[in-house]
C-alpha cells in the first residue's frame, strides 16, 4: 500500500487533543474521517507528536497508508475539501517509502510557546497565547532557561502520569525571542529536542514565567531540575500558547 506523509496545521482549541477519542472531537479523528471519504476504511494515521487538548500545530507530521496511488497535491486538496469547516489543514502531502514512520523516524521536534504580557485581555490572539497581566524580565528568564539546555533528568518537568520509560532527555535548544508591540510585549519560547516528555514544555515555560515575574531566581530553576521531584516544579502553564512548529527527519519528506 502506498504511504503518504502529511504536514498538518490546526487550531487545537475545538479538539480534545490529537489522539482519537471515543466521544470527543480530535484532530486524528477528523483526518481519519476525511480519509474515509476518499477511500473505504478504516483508516489509522500516526503522528510525530500527540498534542494535548488546546495545543496548536503549524508543522505536525503524520503518515497514512492508502489503497490507490494519489498525486500528493490532489490528495492534500481532497482532504482539505472534506475537512471543512474544521480548523485543520493539510499544508503538504508527499509519497514516502513504506519504512517511513512519522513518529519513529523523527530526529527532531520543535515547539513554540507564546506568552503575552499586558493588563488588557487579549482579543485577536484569544485562545492562541497565554496572557499574564504583569511585566516580565526576559534576561532573568534566559538565565533560568540556560540551566535546562542539555541532557538532564527532567523528572521535575514532566507530568506525574507521564508514561515515558525514562525521564532523561536532551534539550538541544531553548531560546527566548522578545516581540515588542504597541499593545503589549510577547515572549516567544523556542524549544528543540529529539523528543519531549508529557507536559515538559508547559512545565518549563510556567516555571520560567515565575522567574520573569521575580517570584523565582534563575538559580532556583537549576535547584528544581536537580531535585528530580515533580513537586519542585513551578506552575504548569495553560495549553493555548503552545504550538508544534516542526518535525525533523534524516531526509525531508516534503523536499
UniProtKB/Swiss-Prot annotation:
Record-linked Pfam families: PseudoU_synth_1
Binding site for substrate: 111
Domain of life where this protein originates: Bacteria
Subunit composition and interactions: Homodimer.
GO biological process, one term: tRNA pseudouridine synthesis
Keyword Transferase recorded: no
Database matches in InterPro entries: PsdUridine_synth_cat_dom_sf (IPR020103), PsdUridine_synth_TruA (IPR001406), PsdUridine_synth_TruA_a/b_dom (IPR020097), PsdUridine_synth_TruA_C (IPR020095), TruA/RsuA/RluB/E/F_N (IPR020094)
Protein name as it appears in the record: tRNA pseudouridine synthase A
Organism name: Cereibacter sphaeroides (strain ATCC 17029 / ATH 2.4.9)
Family: Belongs to the tRNA pseudouridine synthase TruA family.
One annotated GO molecular function: RNA binding
Reaction(s) catalysed (UniProt annotation): uridine(38/39/40) in tRNA = pseudouridine(38/39/40) in tRNA
Keyword list, A-Z: Isomerase, tRNA processing
EC number: 5.4.99.12
CDD domains the UniProt entry points to: PseudoU_synth_EcTruA (cd02570)
Function, in words: Formation of pseudouridine at positions 38, 39 and 40 in the anticodon stem and loop of transfer RNAs.
Catalytic residues (UniProt): 52 (nucleophile)
SUPFAM superfamilies the UniProt entry points to: Pseudouridine synthase
Catalytic EC class: isomerase
Amino acid at each position: 500500500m502506498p504511504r503518504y506523509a502529511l504536514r498538518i496545521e490546526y487550531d487545537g482549541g475545538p479538539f480534545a487533543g490529537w489522539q482519537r477519542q471515543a466521544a470527543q472531537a480530535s484532530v486524528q479523528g477528523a483526518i481519519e474521517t476525511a480519509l474515509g471519504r476518499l477511500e473505504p476504511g478504516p483508516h489509522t494515521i500516526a503522528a510525530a507528536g500527540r498534542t494535548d487538548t488546546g495545543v496548536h500545530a503549524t508543522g505536525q507530521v503524520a503518515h497514512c497508508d492508502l489503497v490507490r496511488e494519489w498525486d500528493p497535491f490532489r490528495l492534500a486538496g481532497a482532504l482539505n475539501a472534506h475537512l471543512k469547516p474544521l480548523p485543520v489543514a493539510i499544508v503538504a502531502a508527499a509519497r514516502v517509502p513504506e519504512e517511513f514512520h512519522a513518529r519513529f523516524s523523527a530526529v527532531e521536534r520543535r515547539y513554540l510557546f507564546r506568552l503575552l504580557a499586558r493588563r488588557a485581555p487579549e482579543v485577536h490572539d484569544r485562545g492562541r497565547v497565554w496572557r499574564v497581566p504583569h511585566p516580565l524580565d526576559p534576561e532573568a528568564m534566559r538565565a533560568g532557561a540556560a540551566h535546562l539546555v542539555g541532557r538532564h533528568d527532567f523528572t521535575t518537568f514532566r507530568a506525574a502520569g507521564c508514561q515515558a520509560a525514562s525521564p532523561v532527555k536532551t534539550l538541544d535548544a531553548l531560546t527566548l525571542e522578545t516581540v515588542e508591540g504597541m499593545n503589549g510585549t510577547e515572549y516567544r519560547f523556542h524549544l528543540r529536542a529529539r523528543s519531549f516528555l508529557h507536559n515538559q514544555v508547559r512545565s518549563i515555560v510556567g516555571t520560567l514565567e515565575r522567574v520573569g515575574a521575580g517570584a523565582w531566581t534563575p538559580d532556583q530553576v537549576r535547584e528544581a531540575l536537580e531535585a528530580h521531584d515533580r513537586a519542585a516544579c513551578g506552575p504548569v502553564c495553560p495549553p493555548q500558547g503552545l504550538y508544534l512548529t516542526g518535525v525533523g527527519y534524516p531526509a525531508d519528506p516534503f523536499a
